[in-house]
Amino acid sequence: KLDHGEYVSLGKVESLLKTCPIIDSICVYGDPSKAYVISLVVPDRNKLTELAEKLDLGTLTFEDQCRHRIITAEVLKEMTSYAKKVKLEKFEIPGAVTLCSELWTPESGLVTAAFKLKRKPIQEYYQKELKAMYGLK
């Protein structure tokens, strides 16, 4: 539930956005005191490199591509237009994204053996990034 009382089904948003070509894995997070959701995305390596090349940033490493603000902004733009295409409500569309260069594997403890998200461990692992997306320190 967001601060204006809208209930967001994180699983629904994730399953629809996971079909966006640039997304390999996604975890959507909603702070009940905020008006929008945010997202952590493990991008598809090839698609991100293609995007970086279009932006003349193809020489960057994958890790640097994931951290580059222009690339991140472009991914968010792609996600937003895709979200509208799959008919997500305005409040279900992530208002910010952090690109994660590390794959989420059962060994990392961030997903189960069946590759289902483990929300708590993901939120703890990316605590700093989640706060930054909401503009908190």
Q: PLM features: residue spans?
A:
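Short, conserved non-catalytic motifs in the polymerase core
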Residues: 110-111
